[in-house]
């Protein structure tokens, strides 16, 4: 979500009033939450994976839910424990991967109703027009953006919110998203052109990226690069900075460290400044003759990538779903033992 858009080279907005209305709306937390609850992530993922496999790629929070664990709880559960303190809309929300724990049209309508009342008092003009650029050469991504448009407009009503899709060449798309030289060149309201992969096994590898001082990343994720901008103050991002900094200072108690990072993630989820949809790990169906889980596995770094071949074992027959599921169950058991040992060893080294 772009909280401080400055350029309108690719827009369907017809006047300054519409530009101001959109910017004001995106600075309203209830409005952003309405968008988050209105996105059907399963249908979004199904544009790549098909209807049957749509849920496999769904992600609900920025940090991978099982990225770290402590005392039998994974990171996602720690976040779920803290979210209800931000409001009743978070009660019962499931943040685990491979299921859509956020899509809820009724919650979307409720949050939007609160937002609309406040925004109308500020003179905001409806419907809110949201510019969404997409690389026209990627048919799957175009379909995914169209699925977001359908679910959001269906949940909130076209008289309230309209997503204007702009199909651009690859160069034009990259120049206003991935490759934009600064925040001023980020020419969008909503973008599907952002992603992040962890570099090391600590929540900070995700959460540090969105601190207000990380301008190279905040320009792409939220459309600003000035940590002291009015938009940053309006949405309260300095509070997020403080939560992340507090967590980073906890170096003696691993459980306390993870709990503090979970608090920062809970704040981020409630803020709805970043709306996760899918993970690259939930890919489309493939034909494989690689023995399931024979290769290296890593939550961070490059050893878990598809380009790391050490330990891989091949087989003559194509891997079946039955074989994969059986191997997965065995792997989960072994991983639980390994994780428990690793967490105990790591706790001894945290200084």
What residues fall within each predicted segment?
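Extracytoplasmic/secreted cell-surface and envelope-processing proteins
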Residues: 8-11, 46, 140-143, 173-176, ...
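Bilobed periplasmic-binding protein-like "clamshell/Venus-flytrap" ligand-binding domains
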Residues: 45-49, 114-137, 238-288, 345
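Alpha-helical secondary-structure segments
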Residues: 1-77, 81, 96-100, 127-137, ...
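Ligand-binding clamshell of periplasmic/extracellular solute-binding protein-like
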Residues: 188-207, 277-280
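Short, solvent-exposed loop/beta-turn-alpha elements that line the ligand-binding surface or hinge
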Residues: 2-26, 68-106, 120-123, 178-184, ...
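Solvent-exposed, polar/charged alpha-helical surfaces in well-ordered, non-transmembrane soluble domains
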Residues: 29, 33, 37, 42, ...
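Ligand/substrate-recognition segments at binding pockets and active sites
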Residues: 53, 86-198, 254, 335
């Amino acid at each position: 979500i772009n909280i401080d858009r400055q350029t309108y080279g690719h827009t369907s907005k017809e006047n300054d009033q519409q530009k101001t209305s959109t910017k004001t709306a995106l600075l309203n937390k209830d409005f952003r939450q309405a968008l988050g609850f209105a996105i059907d992530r399963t249908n979004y993922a199904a544009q790549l994976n098909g209807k049957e496999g749509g849920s496999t790629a769904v992600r609900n929070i920025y940090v991978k839910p099982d990225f770290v664990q402590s005392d039998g709880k994974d990171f996602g559960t720690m976040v779920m424990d803290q979210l209800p303190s931000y409001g009743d809309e978070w009660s019962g929300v499931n943040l685990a991967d491979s299921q859509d724990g956020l899509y809820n049209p009724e919650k979307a309508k409720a949050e939007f109703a609160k937002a609309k009342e406040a925004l109308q008092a500020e003179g905001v003009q409806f419907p809110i027009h949201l510019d969404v650029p997409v690389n026209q050469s990627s048919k799957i991504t175009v379909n995914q953006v169209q699925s977001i448009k359908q679910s959001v407009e269906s949940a909130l009503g076209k008289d309230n919110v309209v997503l204007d899709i702009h199909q651009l060449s690859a160069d034009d798309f990259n120049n206003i998203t991935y490759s934009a030289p600064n925040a001023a060149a980020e020419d969008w309201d909503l973008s599907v052109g952002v992603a992040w992969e962890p570099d090391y096994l600590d929540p900070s590898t995700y959460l540090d990226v969105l601190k207000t001082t990380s301008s190279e990343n905040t320009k792409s994720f939220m459309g600003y690069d000035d940590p002291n901008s009015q938009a940053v103050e309006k949405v309260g991002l300095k509070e997020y900075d403080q939560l992340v900094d507090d967590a980073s200072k906890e170096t003696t108690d691993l459980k306390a460290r993870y709990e503090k990072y979970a608090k920062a993630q809970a704040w981020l989820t409630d803020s709805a400044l970043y709306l996760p949809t899918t993970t690259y790990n939930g890919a489309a169906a493939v034909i494989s003759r690689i023995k399931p889980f024979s290769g290296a596995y890593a939550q961070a770094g490059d050893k878990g990538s598809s380009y790391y071949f050490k330990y891989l074992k091949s087989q003559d027959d194509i891997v079946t779903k039955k074989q994969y599921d059986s191997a997965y169950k065995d792997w989960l058991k072994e991983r639980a033992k390994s994780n428990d040992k690793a967490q105990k060893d790591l706790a001894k080294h945290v200084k």
